[in-house]
Amino acid sequence: MTSTNTRNKGKCIVEGPPPTLSRYESQKSRDWNTFCQYLMTKMPPVHVWECESNHILDFLQSRDQFGKTKVHIQGCVFFGQKEPPGECNCPLKQAWGSLDALIGRLRAAYEENGGLTEKNPFARGGIRIFLREVRGSQAKARGVLYKKKKRLVVVGTGTSTTWT
């Protein structure tokens, strides 16, 4: 493989094949393209710079069809059990961690594609609340307890600390 370097207005440009993307960068690009295509299927089509929280929430819920995590419904005999002893007909959904990672990649891709940080729809409070609710409901359904992290509070001049 040969490549040549040329000068262009003080910037060195390497000609040749594009660099290989990392797994994260490839996934981020795929996620961005999938989201943009999803918006174009809306009636009327929505441009990515016009999308709102409701479009993102609809997209996240549409991802459940590809989920692999069994989430027991309230009336299921296995609801709240970590390791249920049998099978049930409860739905498969996207795991909270997968949705959280997806939002992180889309948040980064939005800004890398020219979106303003302060207008990033993937960083809005409604999206964070949705993810928190999914995390809580999936944890409850699967018998997993998440403990809130305790905050360190510095009292006085910093010589003593207390945990709350």
Curated annotation (Swiss-Prot):
Task performed by this protein:
Probable transcription regulator that acts as a developmental regulator by promoting cell growth in response to light.
Q: By its UniProt entry, which Pfam families does this protein fall under?
A: ALOG_dom
Organism superkingdom? Eukaryota
PROSITE patterns from the UniProt entry = ALOG
What's the protein called, per UniProt?
Protein LIGHT-DEPENDENT SHORT HYPOCOTYLS 8
User: Which UniProt keywords are given for this protein, alphabetically ordered?
Assistant: Developmental protein, DNA-binding, Nucleus, Transcription, Transcription regulation
Please list the residue ranges annotated as the ALOG domain: 23-150
Q: Where does the record say this protein resides?
A: Nucleus
